[in-house]
Each structure stands twice: as structure tokens, then as C-alpha cells.
């Protein structure tokens, strides 16, 4: 599927699924590895008087090229907008055991590759945030070229701020597990803030996702921060896996029409 098709797809879904946005739902399009005949697909759209016989369906046509006129059509089932209560997994271990296992998985994630991850232009569209597991969390300003190169050269060496330092010994007692958000967090103390005269604090919040990365840094109060980090290995624990329903994501299932 080329960029022309993707743009075309976006505008079609933006139009036919506009009613979903009013319910503050996010939609994920899933193209099924199955096919359906045109006759059967049309039957799912309802009778000529407009009565829907099999649910809420639309036919989506995607242009495969810019000018070749080749079009692929799909029968797409729109998600129902009624609210459903997400089911929570049954605990597989005690909270203490869960936190211990999560801590190990987080540590393993950084041992396998590098101990540090960086995110450019994250905080106020100015700062680079560096998370070095077991060492510290820092913020500094750098040029885009330095970020891309991986050298991470601060533009002003005297303005590298330590938001938090890790302790030498990590204990599960330092961590909080949020059953609702399915996250685990740890509070770190950093260097003294010149505005408050107190140490900077940062809550590092880890969650299950498919890419190891810094997602967001928020300054809640002066020199008090929240850092959100995605850790794929946490997804191996059911207590950290979030369903589409919990994420506010509904699937639009599309089957190719032959």
C-alpha cells in the first residue's frame, strides 16, 4: 500500500467514521487475511430500503496507484459505541512478587542493548531527556544533528540538569504498582532546584508497550516531574497488558472483496 492509498484511506475513514469521534473512541483498522464475494458483501449493507440486516458495515475502496485506476474494495465492520466494562486479569502472584519480577524485566531491557535511552524536543519542545537505567535521568538542550548522531553533545554543558538519581540498591518497596493504569513507578531524587531550594523529584512510570522508549516528560510542579517509559518486556506479565477496550481503542475489521 503506497502513500497515495494511505492518504486516501485516511480521508475515507475520517468521513465515514466521524460519528465515532464524538464518543471519544480511537479506531484501529485491521485488514483480515480473508476474502468475501461482492454479492455477499453487498448483502451485509442491508436491503434497498436502508434497513441494516447484519450490523453496521461500510464498503471501503482504496486506490492502489495514483492514476492506474486500480481499486481494491473492503467490507468493513464498524465497532459498536456502547460502553463495556473491561475485564481485569486474575492476579498470578502477590504484589511484592509482581514488583520484583517487573523490576527484573526493566533491568533486563537495558542490559541487552544500552543502559540509556534519549528523547529529543520532548519537554517544552526544547529539552533532550536522557534516561540511564541505574544511573540517572537528565535533561539538556542539544542540536538535532547531535541527537541523530547519537553523540548527544549538550549545547550548553553548564546546563545539564539531573532530574533524578538511582539508588545503589533497588528494593520493591521503592516501587508502586497501579492496578488501574497497569503501571509501576519509582520516585527518584535529583540535584537541588535553584527555584525551590529542594531536590528535584521525578516519578519514573513504566508501562507495557512494543517499543522501548521515553514517551513523555511532564513538569507537574516546579522541579517535580513525571517520566513515562514504555518497556516491551513488561508485556510478558498479564498484570501489565492493556486491552484495546482499556486504551479506548476500537477495532475496525475489514475483509477484502473479490
From Swiss-Prot:
It is a peripheral membrane protein. It comes from Candida albicans (strain SC5314 / ATCC MYA-2876). The gene is YOS9. Gene3D superfamilies: Mannose-6-phosphate receptor binding domain. InterPro entries: Man6P_isomerase_rcpt-bd_dom_sf (IPR009011), MRH_dom (IPR044865), OS-9-like (IPR045149), OS9-like_dom (IPR012913). Keywords: Disulfide bond, Endoplasmic reticulum, Glycoprotein, Lectin, Membrane, Signal. This is Protein OS-9 homolog. A mannooligosaccharide derivative binds at residues 127, 139, 194, 200, 219, 225. Residues 1-18 form the signal peptide. Disulfide bonds join 116-132, 193-223, 208-235. It holds the Pfam family PRKCSH. The lineage of its organism: Eukaryota, Fungi, Dikarya, Ascomycota, Saccharomycotina. Glycans are attached at residues 2, 51, 70, 165.
